């Protein structure tokens, strides 16, 4: 299988006599290369999160293996998840990091060829987040009333099923946009550029990404910011521009709508999980789980994560992630509503 981009992280040669265990046997991972399958493009926020993790993961895996990042975008994470589930060898040398892997499975999205409950979960660095909905400043939509009155707003996103796509759909649905059009197929960086060029009118984005990558959009008045999604609910963003925004659940009209949004919050709470193929040898899986625990507890990791992403790391440890996935709401009526919101068809009536 060909991958779009490859990035080798770490030294190519390690002294063979280093890192031996108490019995004189070299650790399994010494001299090995781990393939880290990333379900996304290079250069976006997700890529920065991975780059923050890699050096610490190498540090805490006995034997300090090389880590080769292989970018595998497509299908809102389904392409990468299907590969890890069905094609990757369960030898402990393939790790995936896949946004949408949980939501796609619970929704029953077309193209899902994996069993969510059979992956081995290693945790995630980003269990909390804030998403904002922005429109191009030139449109003059500087109030919710003007936003609702504007017909045919072009909402840019990644692929159907991607977190940013679903978030944009929730904003459009709950705010009550008139006949929004969803334009997909962009990376995060492309969305920013196309918004400025006027090829799209609006997008959902991570609040800290706006501050980190596109602060001039705010300072120069190039965008209007309309609402925020807090994950978890009640976790206020510290920036004054975002702290005063209406939280998206304010626009829900029924308990059913609130539950659909709560399901999405739960999906996002598990973040972009690191996963292993089903059947990975238990001993190697535990080595990797412990390496992730140590990474997420390392104060230096938190500093590096902040530097690269602009956000504070909020890790979910392996055992916490497994518990969160077991307890995800799977009520059929709510799943069906969520699926309509997250899918390619017109938004459901309210």
What are these regions (language model features)?
Residues 26-271, 329, 343-349:
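Conserved hydrophobic/amphipathic secondary-structure segments
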């Amino acid at each position: 299988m060909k991958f779009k981009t490859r990035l080798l992280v770490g030294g190519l040669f390690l002294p063979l006599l280093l890192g031996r265990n108490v019995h004189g046997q070299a650790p399994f991972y010494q001299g090995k290369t781990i393939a880290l399958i990333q379900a996304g493009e290079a250069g976006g926020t997700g890529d920065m999160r991975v780059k923050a993790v890699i050096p610490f993961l190498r540090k805490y895996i006995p034997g300090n293996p090389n880590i080769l990042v292989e970018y595998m975008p497509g299908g809102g994470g389904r392409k990468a998840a299907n590969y890890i589930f069905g094609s990757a060898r369960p030898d402990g040398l393939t790790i995936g990091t896949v946004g949408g892997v949980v939501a796609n499975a619970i929704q029953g999205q077309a193209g899902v060829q994996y069993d969510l409950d059979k992956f081995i979960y290693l945790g995630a660095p980003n269990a909390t987040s804030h998403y904002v909905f922005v429109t191009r400043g030139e449109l003059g939509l500087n109030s919710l009333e003007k936003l609702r009155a504007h017909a045919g707003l072009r909402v840019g996103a990644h692929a159907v099923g991607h977190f940013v796509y679903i978030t944009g759909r929730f904003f459009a649905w709950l705010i009550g946009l008139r006949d929004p059009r969803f334009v997909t197929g962009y990376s995060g960086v492309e969305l920013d550029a196309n918004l400025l060029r006027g090829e799209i009118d609006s997008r959902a984005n991570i609040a800290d990404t706006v501050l980190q990558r596109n602060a001039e959009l705010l300072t120069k008045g190039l965008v209007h910011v309309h609402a925020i999604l807090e994950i978890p609910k009640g976790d206020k963003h510290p920036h004054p521009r975002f702290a005063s925004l209406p939280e998206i659940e304010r626009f829900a009209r029924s308990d059913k709508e609130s539950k659909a949004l709560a399901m999405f919050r739960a999906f996002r709470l598990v973040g972009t999980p690191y996963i292993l193929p089903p059947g990975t040898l238990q001993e190697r899986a535990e080595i990797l789980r412990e390496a992730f625990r140590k990474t997420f507890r390392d104060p230096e990791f938190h500093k590096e994560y902040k530097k690269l992403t602009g956000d504070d790391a909020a890790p979910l440890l392996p055992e916490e992630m497994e518990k969160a996935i077991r307890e995800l709401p799977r009520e059929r009526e709510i799943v069906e509503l969520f699926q309509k919101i997250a899918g390619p068809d017109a938004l459901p009536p309210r």
